[in-house]
């Protein structure tokens, strides 16, 4: 089954807009790339508890990766969502644009893990995938402590994060039950000589066909793939419509349940800054499938 929604975006409340405007600045300047992590801390509100800067990779991992954990106050076993920040696989601090989404999910009763991963150009693929698979393992191995229902896991994010969310979610070994991928590249070979894809994959498509195929989620779809929620700006200038269209066509071909939320008239950045009801609809989608 597939559902298509065409939306004219509205603005977010001021605090969310401010958070998402920071995302635009980071995309433009990569100013937060070198920021050191803050000391580990725990914050508690009436409805959620947040544990910042939790190391989730093993001690012998190439570089320690951190996550902020959002725990709902409910005593019931909670479904879990892995948030994966964007930034062209090369930048962005995870809190720049994911804190609002993380809090919304946690208030809805989800355990949320907002995780980092190794960045290009220093680290080539599959380092990013390997890090995020460790995040999945962390949730499974700590399910009792954090009251996680590991049979209900999802991946979620936008742009490069959406690409990684799809890649992680479509691997059956990770046991993901739902995917949210916004503004996400689906076939990296659509950029045969792209700078960012070249940094990620070690060069252009020519001579690197195998790794481009391996890093493109469109090739991982099967009849057993989990449901997918896609949202994308109709005027996306960075991740052209051939990406969501190819992904949608492949999902349809294999009979995978999916919903599509088109954000009318928005570019890549503006669809992220002003996403209309894309995020609430994505959370509704998770409610149905987790």
Protein language model features and the residues they cover:
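Primarily recognizes the serine-hydrolase "nucleophile elbow" in alpha/beta-hydrolase
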Residues: 134-193
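C-terminal catalytic histidine-bearing segment of alpha/beta-hydrolase fold enzymes
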Residues: 68, 129, 245-290
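Short beta-strand/loop motif that positions the catalytic acidic residue
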Residues: 230-232, 236
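Conserved alpha/beta-hydrolase "acid-adjacent" motif
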Residues: 237-243
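Short beta-strand element of the alpha/beta-hydrolase
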Residues: 77-87
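Mobile cap/lid helix-loop segments that gate and shape the active-site cleft of serine hydrolases
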Residues: 59, 189-220, 226
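N-terminal cap/lid segment of alpha/beta-hydrolase-fold proteins
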Residues: 39-75
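Catalytic nucleophile-loop/oxyanion-hole region of alpha/beta-hydrolase
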Residues: 56, 93-97, 101, 113-150, ...
